[in-house]
Amino acid sequence: MTVLKPSHWRVLAELADGLPQHVSQLARMADMKPQQLNGFWQQMPAHIRGLLRQHDGYWRLVRPLAVFDAEGLRELGERSGFQTALKHECASSNDEILELARIAPDKAHKTICVTHLQSKGRGRQGRKWSHRLGECLMFSFGWVFDRPQYELGSLSPVAAVACRRALSRLGLKTQIKWPNDLVVGRDKLGGILIETVRTGGKTVAVVGIGINFVLPKEVENAASVQSLFQTASRRGNADAAVLLETLLAELDAVLLQYARDGFAPFVAEYQAANRDHGKAVLLLRDGETVFEGTVKGVDGQGVLHLETAEGKQTVVSGEISLRSDDRPVSVPKRRDSERFLLLDGGNSRLKWAWVENGTFATVGSAPYRDLSPLGAEWAEKVDGNVRIVGCAVCGEFKKAQVQEQLARKIEWLPSSAQALGIRNHYRHPEEHGSDRWFNALGSRRFSRNACVVVSCGTAVTVDALTDDGHYLGGTIMPGFHLMKESLAVRTANLNRHAGKRYPFPTTTGNAVASGMMDAVCGSVMMMHGRLKEKTGAGKPVDVIITGGGAAKVAEALPPAFLAENTVRVADNLVIHGLLNLIAAEGGESEHT
């Protein structure tokens, strides 16, 4: 897998904590002269070479790596009550312990194999575990149970509980995706693979664990310990040895209790950590959906309970995979072939979508100063069966500009007292911004839970919608551009380019950028807290964000908040709301 020699591994392990090391010490470890170290370092893998920084005779890595030396690992194991083996490279750490379990099952108990590179690393259902050197903490260990294999079906979820406890001890908030993935929101942090050997009336369980230590650039939807450590505002860097020792301590304590009492004492903790509890999911086998429904929980055997349209279902892990059900909530299709042009007249831009057979065909947008793209599309696509429906907060002059591009009357729809089963609690619905109303109606294509609906445009609106169809109102604040503009006009020294967002900004530009984003995120989280309290009973409250700044706001929300809640970015939410309304059964509006 690599051409690294023992000297490379020694030097890399010495630098892995990210702290400065003098070149004389590193040269002794590599058995060479200090001036030879640069050539020696060029033999490291490319993604490792670029991490090196040199200053005044000291070397350090810009971020720590999950790389160990045998002696340090042995001492760690002794403190934790485990025998250790270090394999810089192997086929699979699970295979190493499985082989030991078949030869000497008693020796496999609490023997841990740590590896840096695996050629045949795998997860559940034989999936390949992708990683690069130093990016992932990977280890396997054996545990002997006086039980048959069929009684250990809940071992993988209980191992996930132990890992989550360890991460929590380090200040890192994570969740569990059934049965045993460690996740942060939709991003995967780690996985667990359980394999067993039955011998001599006992079962040796081999527990393989892989946790992303550094964020893997080549893997989508991934989280890492290092990134969580930084966003949790912890000082210094994450340390792989501390992480491993904390994991072993929790695994030891949890598995001792599990061997005695089973999974029952851990069910409540697992339920609280389950990312998808109370949410819609799909269960797949070989890529095909076999169940879809709402997660109701797990039982004392780790079996998943699902509420489906056909009734209650129970699912054991086996070869089943779970996915969040992200499909937009369907709306009835019109029975005729009428086509629509839907318009969203915002303050600064016009957006539009052509709808055919209940779905978007094409979408577009343009500033009001040049709406010719809309006129060109109209000339190209119009026929006798196009109905134009819109929502506008842009004012009468801009609405007239839009009308000039279209040779047919536009039906501009206002807010209303109710529509599509949603009651509007605004005191005077006629004063209610229609974009906020149609954002609320559009959110139902993405979630049936209670929702905080956020629109990031010229203004930022943060609205509350209950799961039983009550629009409670919400807040309005200046958008990012208006906040920046007001600071420029009303202050003497803040008329400068906004910088970047930082936890503790140390320049004025960065302070402005961070303050604006904190204001928006704080507003979202306060509304979420109020709606969560009102909804009660542990029900989920989702966040749906739309508008030009939506993605940045979603990224800026605290990791703990993202881990505990569903946050979705939805483009063109107003247009989705218009589509929901016109697609109601028979095309007749409930708008009253």
Curated annotation (Swiss-Prot):
Catalytic activity entry: biotin + L-lysyl-[protein] + ATP = N(6)-biotinyl-L-lysyl-[protein] + AMP + diphosphate + H(+); (R)-pantothenate + ATP = (R)-4'-phosphopantothenate + ADP + H(+)
Type III pantothenate kinase: region residues: 336-592
Location of the active site: D435
GO molecular function, a single term: ATP binding
All residue ranges annotated as the BPL/LPL catalytic domain in the record: 83-259
Pathway: Cofactor biosynthesis; coenzyme A biosynthesis; CoA from (R)-pantothenate: step 1/5
GO terms, biological process: coenzyme A biosynthetic process; protein modification process
CDD domains for this protein: ASKHA_NBD_PanK-III (cd24015), BPL (cd16442)
Cofactor notes: A monovalent cation. Ammonium or potassium.
UniProt KW keywords: ATP-binding, Biotin, Coenzyme A biosynthesis, Cytoplasm, Kinase, Ligase, Multifunctional enzyme, Nucleotide-binding, Potassium, Transferase
Keyword set includes 4Fe-4S: no
Subcellular location: Cytoplasm
Residue numbers binding substrate: Y426, G433, S434, D435, R436, T508
Record-listed E.C. numbers: 6.3.4.15, 2.7.1.33
Record-level GO cellular component terms: cytoplasm
UniProt-annotated stretches for the region Biotin--protein ligase: 1-329
Superkingdom of origin organism: Bacteria
Cofactor(s) the protein needs: NH4(+); K(+)
Residues that, per the record, bind ATP: D344, G345, G346, N347, S348, R349, L350, K351, T458
Family: In the N-terminal section; belongs to the biotin--protein ligase family.
Summary of the function given for this chain in its UniProt record: Activates biotin to form biotinyl-5'-adenylate and transfers the biotin moiety to biotin-accepting proteins.
Protein name: Bifunctional enzyme BirA/CoaX
Species this protein is from: Neisseria meningitidis serogroup A / serotype 4A (strain DSM 15465 / Z2491)
Encoding gene per record: birA/coaX
